[in-house]
Amino acid sequence: MAKHLFTSESVSEGHPDKIADQISDAVLDAILEQDPKARVACETYVKTGMVLVGGEITTSAWVDIEEITRRTVRDIGYVNSEMGFDANSCAVLSAIGKQSPDINQGVDRRDPLEQGAGDQGLMFGYATNETDVLMPAPVTYAHRLVQRQSEVRKSGSLPWLRPDAKSQVTFLYDDGKIAGIDAVVLSTQHSEEISQKDLHEAVMEEIIKPVLPAEWLSANTKYFINPTGRFVIGGPMGDCGLTGRKIIVDTYGGAARHGGGAFSGKDPSKVDRSAAYAARYVAKNIVAAGLADRCEIQVSYAIGVAEPTSIMIETFGTEKVSTEQLTLLVREFFDLRPYGLIQMLDLLHPIYQETAAYGHFGREHFPWEKTDKAAQLREAAGL
């Protein structure tokens, strides 16, 4: 393979779409804390001065959606109108209904193992050995840049930083291996008084250099820091935000295929979310076991049916055993029925708000990031 470039982006917790994702998942967590069997599909819309929370929720729990919303926005950092959004004064509207009984009858079963999928759909999982967290490098470092922006902002060391930010990193590959970083884009919302010269210098020294490995940077690396020259108006004042609008940021940065289903605001009976987590778990364990350098898995479901309708594995010519054998190993060691994967990954807990910014994958404390099946897979494969 010749040299090629590959780019991924990320956005901060203060990006409008990510505000919406975090509110949806904060509502989900609050409900799961009281009622682990709740059915939740929570969507959020944010715009200047208002938040609208809607969806279908069936639960025995009671939660204060307005308080959850304000607390989430406050924790992100939108606490005065100068930033374009204020947790204390924004309107919070709620339009919540119940899950359709037509869907419910296909999901709930007397035998939990026969729990049906909450919808039809296809989901992908992916892993690669190019980083220590078995994730593609471009999206990994794009996330780390905006995470660093948030840390610096919240520490107060750069008081002119504001919550809304975006990053983008272009990697150069040579024969499939990382050869360096070709370009870095970082745009951050800021207060009126900071000069562009001071902003450029501070972003480079306090955000970019501490995050990106020096060995991948060179005199040829291009830097684009607030390339429009001004980013004072941001957050929901600059753009409206919606739950589920950053599905590539949430997953693999475009390095793997995506089934189209968003994650945030959905309880684990929704295979859009839970099966995508399980697919990552499978792919990561295959790579951790040394059975392939790269692995992409597709699973699909029919609404109301427990067993997946298909399982497909792609290893891009890096497999150490046949993909047919890998598929048999997956069926043997991983239960990909909805109830099975919920139990396998212990998903009925309030763990979701943290997933809603900086990527659902590649952060080791989430249960789908465990590599506890790797040794078994390797032994069963005869390696």
UniProtKB/Swiss-Prot annotation:
InterPro entries linked to this entry: ADOMET_SYNTHASE_CS, S-AdoMet_synt_C, S-AdoMet_synt_central, S-AdoMet_synt_N, S-AdoMet_synthetase, S-AdoMet_synthetase_sfam
Note on how the cofactor is bound: Binds 2 divalent ions per subunit. Binds 1 potassium ion per subunit.
Residues at which L-methionine binds: E56, Q99, D239, K270
CDD domains assigned to the protein according to its UniProt record, in alphabetical order: S-AdoMet_synt
Cofactor needs: Mg(2+); K(+)
Binding-site residues, Mg(2+): D17
Localization (cell): Cytoplasm
Coiled-coil boundaries: none
GO molecular function: ATP binding; magnesium ion binding; methionine adenosyltransferase activity
Residue ranges of the region described as Flexible loop: 99-109
Record: residues binding ATP: H15, D164, A165, K166, R230, F231, D239, R245, K246, A262, K266
A cellular-component GO term for this protein: cytoplasm
Keyword terms: ATP-binding, Cytoplasm, Magnesium, Metal-binding, Nucleotide-binding, One-carbon metabolism, Potassium, Transferase
Listed EC numbers: 2.5.1.6
Gene Ontology BP, a term: one-carbon metabolic process
Pathway linked to the protein: Amino-acid biosynthesis; S-adenosyl-L-methionine biosynthesis; S-adenosyl-L-methionine from L-methionine: step 1/1
Positions that bind K(+): E43
Cross-referenced PANTHER family: S-ADENOSYLMETHIONINE SYNTHETASE (PTHR11964)
Entry similarity comment: Belongs to the AdoMet synthase family.
Reported function: Catalyzes the formation of S-adenosylmethionine (AdoMet) from methionine and ATP. The overall synthetic reaction is composed of two sequential steps, AdoMet formation and the subsequent tripolyphosphate hydrolysis which occurs prior to release of AdoMet from the enzyme.
Known partners and oligomeric status: Homotetramer; dimer of dimers.
Entry protein name: S-adenosylmethionine synthase
Species whose genome carries this gene: Pectobacterium carotovorum subsp. carotovorum (strain PC1)
